[in-house]
Regions:
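Short Fe-S-cluster ligation motifs
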Residues: 322-361, 387-393
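Active-site mouth loops of central-metabolism enzymes
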Residues: 1-19, 68-81, 112-115, 145, ...
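A short, structured active-site edge motif that brings together acidic residues
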Residues: 61-74, 103, 169-171
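Active-site groove signature of glycoside hydrolases
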Residues: 90-114
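N-terminal binding-site loop/beta-alpha segment at the start of enzyme catalytic domains
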Residues: 1-63, 126-132
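Beta/alpha (TIM)-barrel catalytic core signal, keyed to glycine-rich beta->alpha loops juxtaposed to Asp/Glu
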Residues: 44, 106-314, 321-341, 366, ...
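Acidic (Asp/Glu)-rich catalytic clusters
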Residues: 29-30, 52-62, 87-96, 129-131, ...
């Protein structure tokens, strides 16, 4: 999903660094990775094509490929538009069958959207027939949002209306008990699948990177137990430990991320009960830090006014984790925190792309899997920035 990018030749935006993608894919396959997840909407619509180019250089039987019937504008929700999207995936990825095909982000718009997007237009029936003839090997869905839709989709399975071969859920040691935004507790999501023996594909094991960029005292707590292991490895061991997990996804942009994950899973050492409880206690400590549940998926982009939404939210979360979001000018480290926040903000986000340019058009929020009220958060951050600049906290 998060393939590496480089500046576009015309200076407008970014483009996928295909050489870097090829290198990552080659190394991954050489070291046992065999499941590659993409979508028509990832990386501004270029992910499927880039993934296909990289994988075409390897024997088809050496990897499993997963992609999705994504939620673009409702204009694409017709049967004709959906089938066109489905067929274009084959063309872009240069394959004649797809190993794992998903209904993308069910629950994101509630029951009405689920029906319109996948049931009323006959797409579930179409995809079941595609599975019967072998163009799809396994059919499932990914979930974000309304738990009523999650339960209904599983009831369809129970009633024999459609057999789901797998389901993709968000699972990590924070969301197991402390899910926020639109995320339902991972414990419930996983248990409902396990009782039906439906394999679970795990997304967001790092909670959008937040479980690899934790506050210093959390780093110290984890390093105290396993000094040689990365902070991220704890989250990946947790995600891979449940019995009915099929595979764990990771958006690995850099080679060092890939190598660290390979070390964690070569072989995977499941967590003990004591280690699992240690992580739950760690999650309780992390809940004292009020971060915004942005996972840098960039579904909210591009902003029509040029705002770099993910960069703003990620900078804010980074400062929260580092203790650089002062509540008052009377705070002991106010001067240091004020400077760290403002200097880091200008370095992370160009001035013309900062939160003060938000008009509140709300084009972004409906696309957010975490159901963040993005204009509200941007206005809150902009107000905080102005208070820091004017020293009126």
């Amino acid at each position: 999903m998060r393939w590496p990018t480089v500046p576009a030749p015309d200076g407008k935006g970014e483009m996928i660094d295909q050489d870097a993608v090829n290198e990552l894919v080659d190394y991954a396959i050489a070291h046992g990775v065999n499941y590659f997840d993409t979508s028509p909407m990832y990386v501004q619509g270029w992910s499927e094509k880039s993934t296909g180019i990289a994988l075409k250089r390897h024997p088809r039987e050496s990897f499993y490929l997963a992609t999705k019937l994504s939620n673009f504008h409702p204009d694409t929700w017709t049967r004709e538009g959906s089938i066109a999207m489905y067929r274009k995936s084959f063309e872009d990825m240069q394959v004649d069958y797809i190993d794992y095909y998903l209904l993308h982000m069910i629950g994101g718009g509630g029951m009405e959207q689920f029906r319109k997007r996948y049931i009323d237009n006959g797409m579930i029936d179409f995809l079941v027939k595609e599975r019967e003839v072998g163009r799809i090997r396994r059919l499932g869905w990914s979930f974000h949002g309304d738990i009523e839709v999650y339960d209904y989709a599983l009831q369809m399975h129970d009633r024999g209306e459609v057999h789901w071969d797998f389901v993709q859920i968000q699972l990590n040691y924070v969301d197991w008990k402390h899910a926020s935004g639109s995320n339902f507790k991972a414990e419930y999501l996983y248990d409902e699948l396990a009782k039906r023996k439906i394999p679970a594909v795990i997304m967001e094991p790092l909670l959008g990177g937040r479980l690899s960029n934790v506050p210093d005292h959390i780093v110290a707590r984890l390093k105290q137990r396993e000094p040689e292991r990365s902070v991220a490895s704890w989250a990946f061991r947790y995600a891979g430990s449940p019995q009915d997990v099929l595979t764990v996804l990771s958006g690995m942009t850099y080679m060092e991320h890939l190598q660290d994950n390979i070390r964690t899973y070569s072989p995977l050492v499941p967590l003990t009960e004591e280690e699992t409880q240690y992580l739950y206690d760690t999650a309780d400590l992390m809940m004292e830090y009020p971060t915004i549940p942005c996972n840098d998926c960039k579904y909210c982009m591009p902003c029509p006014y040029g705002i770099d939404i993910p960069a703003i939210l990620i900078h804010y979360n980074k400062c929260v984790n580092e203790g650089n979001v002062p509540e008052s000018s009377q705070d002991e480290n106010y001067r240091k925190a004020r400077r760290a926040f403002l200097v880091g903000y200008d370095r992370s986000v160009p001035k013309l792309r900062q939160a003060d340019h938000c008009t509140g058009c709300n084009q972004c929020s409906p696309h957010c899997p975490q159901t963040i009220d993005i204009p509200k958060e941007l206005h809150r951050i902009d107000k905080f920035v102005e208070q820091l600049k004017q020293e009126t906290l």
